[in-house]
């Protein structure tokens, strides 16, 4: 079987000649952007020869201002494909696809709503403190925070669709928020789930497929039961 044929068969629970596989990593920062990133991806794909080739995304939602209170989230403006960080990732995808094995199942990395919401201020606080800050601000005054998250989600929907338009088979959606020690089940359902589903639906509507990556430790996988139909075993 060819690589893409093998992956699609596995997604449909059909017989395969072997289990399709892939490996992925965050490349060192010095080769994470621009031409260096293109070459590093191609080298990695050639050495690993995976069925699924995932293009990494280190082009993150940028800082838009200091955020110390829930009201400060109003500084997060709408994002679109015209933003430089999106243009940079689009260019990376184009250049990798121009030279990579198109017999493979090719996907882009789309950081989910939680990751993309904290990325603008993560350098200011550190990874765990900024995640705790997001939870705290949502509990204190959810309206301005959810408004900011909606603006981010709308932009991510555009990127998901663009990935498919460029020729990718879909996205790896990197979901956060399922960990028991941060959001409660009810908070996840209200604050996170609607945006996750909005973005994953955008990929499906564009003709792509989703691989759902549920990140981190102590994840309550039951929170994702209603996502069935949005990811690749549908």
PLM regions: where:
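Active-site loop segments of alpha/beta catalytic cores
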Residues: 1-35, 40, 51-55, 81-234
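Short N-terminal amphipathic alpha-helices
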Residues: 46-64
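A short glycine/small-residue-enriched secondary-structure motif
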Residues: 58-76
């Amino acid at each position: 079987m060819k690589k893409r044929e093998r992956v699609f068969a596995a997604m449909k629970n059909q017989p395969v000649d072997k289990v399709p596989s892939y490996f992925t990593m965050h490349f060192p920062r010095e080769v994470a952007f621009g031409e260096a990133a293109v070459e590093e991806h191609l080298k990695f794909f050639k050495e690993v020869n995976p069925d699924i080739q995932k293009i990494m995304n280190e082009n993150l939602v940028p800082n838009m201002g200091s955020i110390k209170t829930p009201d400060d989230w109003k500084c997060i403006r709408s994002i679109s494909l015209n933003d430089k960080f999106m243009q940079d990732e689009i260019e990376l995808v184009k250049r990798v696809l121009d030279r990579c094995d198109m017999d493979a199942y090719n996907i882009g990395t789309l950081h989910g709503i939680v990751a993309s919401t904290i990325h603008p201020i993560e350098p200011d606080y550190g990874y765990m403190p900024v995640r705790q800050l997001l939870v705290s601000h949502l509990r204190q005054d959810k309206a301005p925070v959810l408004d900011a998250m909606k603006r981010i989600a709308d932009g991510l929907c555009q990127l998901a669709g663009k990935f498919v338009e460029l020729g990718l088979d879909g996205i790896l959606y990197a979901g956060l928020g399922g960990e028991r020690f941060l959001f409660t089940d009810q908070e996840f359902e209200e604050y996170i789930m609607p945006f996750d589903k909005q973005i994953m639906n955008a990929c499906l509507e564009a003709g792509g497929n989703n691989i759902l990556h549920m990140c981190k430790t102590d994840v309550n996988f039951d929170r994702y039961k209603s996502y069935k139909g949005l990811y690749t075993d549908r």
